[in-house]
Amino acid sequence: MAKLLQSPPKFLPAEWYIANKSQYHRAEAQRSRSERLVAESQRLVEEIEKTTRKSQSDVNKKLEQRLEEVKFWKKELDDKLEHLVNETEDLLTYKIRLERSLESYKEPLHITEKCLAYREKRVGIDLVHDVVDQELQKEADIIHGVMNLLTRTVEEATEQIRLNRSAKYNLEKDLKDKFTAITIDDICFSLNNNSPDIKYSENVVRIEPNSVSLEDWLDFSNTNMQKADKQLNNSMALKTLVDQILSQTANDLRRQCEVVDTAFVNGLKETKDARNKLADHLAKVMDEIASQEKNIEVLENAITQQEGPAKVAHTRLENRTYRPNVELCRDVAQYRLIREVQEIKHNVARLEETLAQAQIQLKALFRRQLALQEEIQVKENTIYIDQVLCMEMRKSIPPRDGDDHGAWEGGIRAEAIC
């Protein structure tokens, strides 16, 4: 207790000086360290502010560059989309042309097949597989081939339109995403330290797991562009093919139509010539019938005219049998009368034989007359079928110029055949 109440120890003056000096030094050292820290802090603040400004400026520049890059690709995609849309609309028009062309071949095919059916109604020897039949069948085969080709081309156009729309969908989706990205980056680019809607966000300093690399991003847009380019090229090639098909088929059908019409004209001329020759022969046969009938009449009259002389000769011979006794002489007159009767009998036999031959010839002429009349009727039937039924019906086939390359009158023109 006594120790606790003792007064504190006293120091020597030297100790006092030393203690004060020590305080001075420690204070000076502390102040110096503090000053260095203040200076370092100021330098650090300035450095960080400069770095922050530089980083923010760099980010702004990168955002601006990114915006320009995305906008560039968006414009490229926009242009490609517009081109693809226009090309698809063109292809739709071409498809309509193909469908109308396909439809327009039905009536000519019907006419050709009907001509073939009509010509099956020819009769007799005229039911021949002639050049007209061959060319009509060839025309029908060509039209069938053209229709099959057009049907396949319509299917190709339909598929190409589907592929174009698929590429269009991909472009539109890419454009939509790029528009959203541009909108977001525009907002980000416009932000500054004084913007009212800036804030801290949790867990944003990260790489999204579903994000893609810049190379993947470029590949994606490039792929969409390449797919669109491929469909554009395919569409343009298909349009060129359609133009060629429509032009070539028009020319083929026009040429074949001309061949068929020429065959009809030539065949009709040949049939008419045959009919006219038959008519000439019929007229000659008719004249010969009249001549033969007159000849028969002359022969019959000649036979009749021999009856008088025959009766006279017979009467003379009979009367001379009544000569008496030696007067019943075989004189010259008697022999001449006998010879006269024999001559008349022989002449009548000759006349009757000639008459029989004339009657046979007349019957043959009548048969020939009937055959010629029937054959002329066969020719008339053929002429009626070819000229009245077929050739008149073929006039309803619309003409085709063969130079259709897609320019339709009034925007859309029905396709013709020949």
Swiss-Prot record:
GO cellular component: a single term: microtubule cytoskeleton
Cited InterPro entries: Tektin-like (IPR048256), Tektins (IPR000435)
Keywords: Cell projection, Cilium, Coiled coil, Cytoplasm, Cytoskeleton, Flagellum, Microtubule, Ubl conjugation
Localization annotation: Cytoplasm, Cytoskeleton, Cilium axoneme; Cytoplasm, Cytoskeleton, Flagellum axoneme
Tissue specificity: Predominantly expressed in testis.
Keyword Transport set for record: no
Pfam families assigned to the protein according to its UniProt record, in alphabetical order: Tektin
Keyword Coiled coil tagged: yes
Biological process according to GO: cilium assembly; cilium movement involved in cell motility; flagellated sperm motility
Highest taxon above the source species: Eukaryota
Processing and modification events after translation: Ubiquitinated, leading to its degradation. Deubiquitinated by USP16, promoting its stability.
Coiled coil ranges: 20-107, 134-177, 266-308, 332-383
Function statement: Microtubule inner protein (MIP) part of the dynein-decorated doublet microtubules (DMTs) in cilia and flagellar axoneme. Forms filamentous polymers in the walls of ciliary and flagellar microtubules.
Family: Belongs to the tektin family.
Subunit structure: Microtubule inner protein component of sperm flagellar doublet microtubules.
Name this protein carries in UniProt: Tektin-1
Species this chain originates from: Rattus norvegicus (Rat)
Gene that encodes the chain: Tekt1
